[in-house]
């Protein structure tokens, strides 16, 4: 298929060819545990004061649904919809919602750049570390705008990893963040997307 395994992204082009969506964090058990530990109270705290009961909310790139389920509780009796490109994530999300007995939430396969919803379908759209997967977030944001009701609410939480402080410089943690940034850039993402919003 013309694909090449790159073990050292520093030796390759920093511009990724168009290979479709590549989720740099991957789906290892460690990565999935980290994603499942996220909560709306911490990771969507900035958005919570603006949400109201009865809203219809979309969570783009919902992963295992831990944030989505919390947002569903906030907008109840409204609805929350979580989308992700990885069915394995959605299986975990559905199980999490069932475990928490949250019934006003649904999960389905979806791509933020081609949302499977009609125009003006949501009162609010949220995303956590999803726009960082793209060098150009405009196609994703255009889709968000399309499915958002007039006057709707948009909230994305994106990183600015260049502001991370790892001491001492050159430590394993410092090297890890730099490597992650190079791999993310190679895969078509931007480790400092938060700076661009």
Give the role of each language-model region.
Residues 37-55, 70, 74:
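Conserved alpha-helix/loop element of class I SAM-dependent methyltransferases that forms part
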Residues 138-153:
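A short glycine-rich, Lys/Arg-flanked "PGG" loop and its adjoining helix->strand segment in the class I
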Residues 155-197:
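Conserved catalytic/acceptor-binding region of the Class I
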């Amino acid at each position: 298929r013309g694909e090449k395994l790159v073990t050292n992204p520093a030796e390759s082009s920093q511009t990724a060819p168009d290979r479709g969506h590549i989720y740099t964090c991957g789906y290892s058990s460690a990565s999935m545990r980290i994603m499942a530990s996220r909560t709306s109270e911490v990771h969507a705290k900035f958005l919570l004061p603006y949400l109201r009961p009865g809203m219809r909310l979309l969570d783009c790139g919902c992963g295992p649904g831990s944030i989505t389920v919390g947002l569903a509780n906030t907008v109840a009796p409204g609805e929350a919809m979580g989308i992700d490109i990885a069915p394995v994530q959605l299986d975990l999300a559905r199980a999490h919602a069932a475990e928490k007995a949250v019934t006003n939430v649904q999960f389905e396969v979806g791509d933020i750049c081609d949302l499977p919803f009609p125009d003006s379908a949501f009162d609010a759209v949220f995303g956590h570390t999803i726009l960082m997967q793209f060098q150009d977030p405009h196609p994703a944001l255009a889709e968000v705008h399309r499915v958002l009701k007039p006057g709707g609410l948009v909230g994305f939480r994106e990183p600015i990893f260049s502001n991370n402080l790892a001491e001492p410089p050159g430590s394993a943690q410092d090297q890890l963040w730099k490597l992650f940034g190079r791999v993310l850039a190679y895969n078509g993402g931007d480790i400092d997307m938060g700076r661009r919003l």
